[in-house]
């Protein structure tokens, strides 16, 4: 072995190998930078690397066989009297070491500065799919291909599809439109700021099907991308739509395409056309509030495809909206069992809906929507869902951030901008709320909620007359606007202490709500009426109104003020029942309210310190405006004026949360009425 090493050294093999490795290393690193700059094909760099690898053993062999002399290159084994060029020596060692060092430094520099392979952050692309032109005459394709195409293109992280049913509804409001054809889709896209319209067609030729789709600029109609595929028979049509979606994604610049995952046939069974068509009809009916009718079509879809996960989740939502909670819970279990039949995007959306609407597990819902946003940053439903969940956890800054991301994708989204205005209102940023609400009214003058921030800003500024004017404008828009406005007008009167004026407004509003079937609105007004009756000393009338409200709705927004009135009426057991129901829920805000009621019962019994401890524990669960307000009152009752002043000051600073204290966009500014008095008492207790 030692002899071999000596011979390798004598023949300069080690030095030649080091020199070769250093030069090849530098060449490859340089090529990895220069070739992409000149749009060279990927195979050029691969060929260079392969050549370098293949060349290494060849160089070693040549170094063993040949030597460089003053007469040129000679075979080392030949006898010669020529003088060998001084290729060796310490000087050459330094040269080889230097080249290797340069190669190493260059490589480290390239890795540090370039980082991991960067994924190009593409701008979000919103897409509205127009009705396919069905030239086959087969109605089975109507409303089916559009849904399949949307599922396929939404697998691209930067693409989000605009709801077709919402688009059709908007198109109908803009003109005499009954179908979402290319012209109607372009009109809606321009109005809503949607970046692309996809218009497709399907035709049949001797049992084979040809599908063609164009991606259009909605303003000028320029074709930005197109794709065409064929299907051998009807059963292959949905799979062909998946291939079509893949081609369009590639043309739009999607580098994450995995055609095996994209194939629509993985999401639908062989009976998918029938299932997909029934599902599309169910979705449209559900969107338009026809829940009973949607149930039949969801079940039809499930009969055609028993593993149709999205149909189960849609059915569960409709059943829940109809109050059929037991059926809804059972259906949700089936939806969760069939998550595997969904695309990753649909799976995360479904989990977000389940956590937010069924279990009310806000933290898990936020996790699902955050995962959805991370993987599909253009998903408008993800940003909207994330914003709403942050809102319900009282993180208004995070809600504004997520809501702002939604508006970056859909700047023309009326609902998105209205929500953004309301988040600002709850955060107490009334100027921003009013400015955004004005933009909402510019987009859609019939959006009645855009007047709520205006009314609340006026009340916060002490201008009750301006608040009434805002409610008058709201009432003139629609029936729901009139319902909210009547509660708002009564709320203003109660804030001013004019309970006598509030009662007839509430009574008339209740009658209108009951006539229109608006149970929640009627229940909320009954609770407000009960508060007015209690304030004027008519406890019996107040309890009667309270019980009527609870019969219509027993959500937190009704139960919590009901419990407060039960305590006032001395019916502590009924208050405890409500508290027990609230603390047994998963949602932290509900449990915090339950603990607040328990604390107020303790306070009523003279247990001031225990009540304060209970209120503090409630705040640790959820920092709610109403809990902080009552902790201030408890502190003051117990003689802790400084602590009470801190609580009341915090409530004054968080006026936005009192605008609709139960986060349902229904006015409760009346709860601010006696806050200045309580703050004054606390300050008086400190001699201020």
What are these regions (language model features)?
Residues 138-146:
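Glycine- and acidic-residue-enriched helix-capping/strand-helix junction motifs
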Residues 94-101, 105-120, 148, 152, ...:
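Catalytic-center loop of serine/cysteine hydrolases
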Residues 135, 148-159, 188-191, 247-255, ...:
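Structured segments of extracytoplasmic/periplasmic soluble domains
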Residues 1-107, 192, 219-222:
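An N-terminal, helix-rich hydrophobic module
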């Amino acid at each position: 072995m030692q002899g071999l090493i000596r011979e390798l050294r004598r023949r300069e093999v080690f030095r030649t190998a080091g020199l070769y490795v250093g030069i090849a290393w530098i060449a490859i690193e340089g090529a990895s930078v220069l070739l992409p700059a000149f749009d060279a094909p990927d195979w050029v760099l691969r060929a260079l690397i392969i050549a370098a690898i293949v060349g290494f053993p060849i160089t070693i062999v040549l170094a063993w066989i040949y030597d460089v002399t003053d007469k040129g290159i000679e075979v080392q084994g030949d006898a010669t009297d020529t003088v060998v060029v001084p290729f060796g020596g310490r000087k050459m060692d330094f040269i080889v070491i230097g080249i290797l060092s340069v190669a190493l430094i260059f490589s480290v520099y390239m890795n540090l500065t370039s980082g991991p392979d960067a994924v190009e952050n593409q701008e979000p692309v919103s897409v509205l799919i127009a009705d396919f032109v069905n030239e086959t005459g087969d109605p089975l394709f109507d409303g089916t291909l559009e849904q399949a195409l949307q599922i396929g293109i939404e697998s691209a992280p930067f693409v989000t599809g605009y709801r077709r049913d919402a688009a059709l509804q908007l198109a109908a409001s803009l003109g005499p439109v009954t179908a979402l054809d290319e012209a109607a889709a372009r009109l809606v896209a321009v109005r809503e700021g949607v970046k692309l319209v996809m218009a497709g067609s399907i035709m049949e030729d001797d049992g084979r099907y040809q599908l063609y789709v164009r991606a259009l600029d909605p303003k000028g109609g320029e074709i930005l991308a197109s794709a065409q595929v064929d299907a051998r028979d009807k059963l292959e049509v949905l799979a062909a739509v998946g291939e079509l979606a893949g081609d369009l994604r590639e043309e739009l610049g999607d580098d994450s395409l995995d055609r095996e995952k994209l194939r629509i046939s993985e999401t639908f069974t062989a009976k998918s056309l029938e299932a997909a068509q029934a599902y599309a009809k169910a979705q449209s009916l559900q969107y338009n509030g026809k829940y009973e009718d949607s149930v039949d079509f969801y079940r039809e879809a499930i009969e055609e495809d028993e593993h149709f996960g999205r149909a189960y989740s849609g059915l569960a939502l409709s059943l829940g909206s109809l109050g059929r909670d037991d059926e809804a819970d059972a259906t949700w279990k089936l939806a969760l069992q069939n998550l595997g039949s969904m695309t990753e995007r649909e799976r995360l959306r479904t989990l977000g809906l389940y956590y937010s609407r069924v279990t009310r597990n806000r933290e898990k819902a936020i996790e699902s929507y955050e995962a959805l946003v991370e993987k599909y940053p253009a998903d408008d439903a993800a940003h909207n869902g994330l914003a709403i969940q942050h809102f319900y956890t009282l993180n208004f800054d995070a809600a504004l951030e997520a809501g702002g991301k939604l508006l970056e994708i859909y700047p023309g989204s009326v609902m998105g901008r209205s929500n953004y205005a309301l988040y600002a209102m709850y955060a107490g940023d009334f100027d921003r709320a009013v400015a955004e609400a004005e933009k909402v009214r510019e987009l859609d003058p019939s959006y009645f909620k855009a007047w709520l921030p205006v009314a609340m800003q006026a009340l916060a500024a002490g201008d009750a007359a301006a608040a009434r004017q805002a409610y008058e404008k709201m009432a003139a828009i629609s029936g729901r606007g009139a319902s909210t406005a009547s509660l708002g007008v009564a709320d203003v009167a109660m804030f001013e202490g004019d309970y006598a004026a509030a009662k007839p407004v509430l009574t008339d509003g209740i009658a209108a709500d009951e006539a229109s079937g608006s149970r929640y609105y009627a229940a909320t007004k009954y609770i407000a009426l009960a508060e007015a009756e209690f304030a004027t000393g008519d406890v019996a009338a107040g309890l009667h109104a309270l019980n009527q409200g609870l019969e219509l709705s027993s959500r937190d927004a009704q139960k919590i003020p009901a419990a407060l009135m039960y305590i006032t009426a001395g019916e502590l057991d009924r208050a405890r029942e409500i508290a027990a129901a609230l603390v047994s829920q998963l949602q932290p805000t509900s449990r915090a309210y339950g603990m607040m009621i328990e604390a107020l019962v303790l306070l009523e019994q003279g247990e001031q310190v225990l009540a304060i401890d209970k209120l503090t524990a409630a705040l640790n669960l959820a920092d709610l405006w109403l809990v902080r307000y009552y902790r201030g009152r408890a502190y003051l009752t117990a003689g802790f004026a400084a602590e009470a002043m801190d609580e009341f000051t915090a409530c004054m600073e968080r006026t936005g949360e009192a605008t609709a204290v139960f986060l349902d966009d229904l006015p409760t500014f009346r709860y601010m009425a006696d806050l200045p008095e309580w703050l004054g008492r606390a300050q008086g207790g400190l001699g201020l």
